[in-house]
Amino acid sequence: MKVRPSVKPICEKCKVIKRKGKVMVICENPKHKQKQG
């Protein structure tokens, strides 16, 4: 899980979602998981 000021999809399988008001990227590749913070 990476915490970044700006989250972007890295590959075509990355999905940008919102959980509890936070923007997150979820993906099949665990290295692509990101959280805005």
UniProtKB/Swiss-Prot annotation:
<dbReference type="InterPro" id="IPR035977">
    <property type="entry name" value="Ribosomal_bL36_sp"/>
</dbReference>
<dbReference type="GO" id="GO:0005737">
    <property type="term" value="C:cytoplasm"/>
</dbReference>
<dbReference type="Pfam" id="PF00444">
    <property type="entry name" value="Ribosomal_L36"/>
</dbReference>
<dbReference type="GO" id="GO:0006412">
    <property type="term" value="P:translation"/>
</dbReference>
<comment type="similarity">
    <text>Belongs to the bacterial ribosomal protein bL36 family.</text>
</comment>
<keyword id="KW-0687">Ribonucleoprotein</keyword>
<keyword id="KW-0689">Ribosomal protein</keyword>
<protein>
    <recommendedName>
        <fullName>Large ribosomal subunit protein bL36</fullName>
    </recommendedName>
</protein>
<dbReference type="InterPro" id="IPR000473">
    <property type="entry name" value="Ribosomal_bL36"/>
</dbReference>
<dbReference type="GO" id="GO:1990904">
    <property type="term" value="C:ribonucleoprotein complex"/>
</dbReference>
<dbReference type="GO" id="GO:0003735">
    <property type="term" value="F:structural constituent of ribosome"/>
</dbReference>
<dbReference type="GO" id="GO:0005840">
    <property type="term" value="C:ribosome"/>
</dbReference>
